[in-house]
Amino acid sequence: FIQATDSHTCMGGASNALTYGVGSTEYANLVHNQFAFVKVPESIRFELEGELNPGCTAKDVILHILWRYAKYSDTLDRSMEFGGPGLASLSMDERATLCNMATECSAKTGICEPDQLTINWLLERRSDLSEKVIRDAFVLPDKDAHYDGGIHTINLNEIRPMVAHPGDPDEGVPSDPTNGAYIDEIGDVKINIAYAGSCTAGKDDDFSYYAMVTKAALDAGMKIAEGVECYIQFGSKTVKDLSERNGWTDLFEAAGVKLIDPGCGACIGAGPGVSNNPDQVTVSAINRNFQGRSGPGKLYLASPLTVMASAFTGKITAWHPDMFSNG
């Protein structure tokens, strides 16, 4: 059970930890007293089946959940439980994306059922643990458990590349992460800024996505589209080191990407990547698109693959492995 003073503490649920973000006063009491009173939240379960298609990531899955469930308060104040056979196809980083954005779903937390991947991930990082110790500590649902929010099946094969659009506050449509839309149905949306990174999309796997798209574009003789500023922010020093070791940093720089050191950035309206005027359009891998939060412009949330592909085409574009080779 982990509590910390960050709204996205819940991304720790990827490793089967129960994780809450709390306020500074509550956290101070926790540190002083070494215990906390917690009301057990209601739960909602998402049963994942199948595997994602090329061009889709866990970000598209959570955008789908925001659109189809959180929009109607199905996830409000509940623990979002992710399980089912399809979960095995998602890496630990991808599971972290799901749990991270439980916050945007207005949920209490997000947690993934543990499996062999969980064990392997922990053993790689904790020399003091054994497989038996980890298994004994697994947090699993009771058999025949009742879910106040219900059990909802999500077929990963049916997930399509998505965005959360900025809405139109002047017409009564608020800017909100629950404004889901399929990319192939929004028409041509030209962009000024492509922003990749943040706690949601600055992990090892996310950077492998950015590098894959960038390499494909460079191999096709392309660079970041004219009139587009592309930023990639490292999620941590460890991720930055990995990028340098794998040669990804060189790829990004060759393509014209502007790199940013780890830290909270455009998500909170700080640093490079923030829009300057209401006419600017940003496609971003961050987790929130509330009006004014990342500058006065319009902000579309999307997956790491979509953000990077869009940086090279100059408009919001879903990634496909052959998109650049086909001209």
What function would you assign to each model-found segment?
Residues 1-327:
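Fe-S-dependent hydro-lyases/dehydratases of central metabolism
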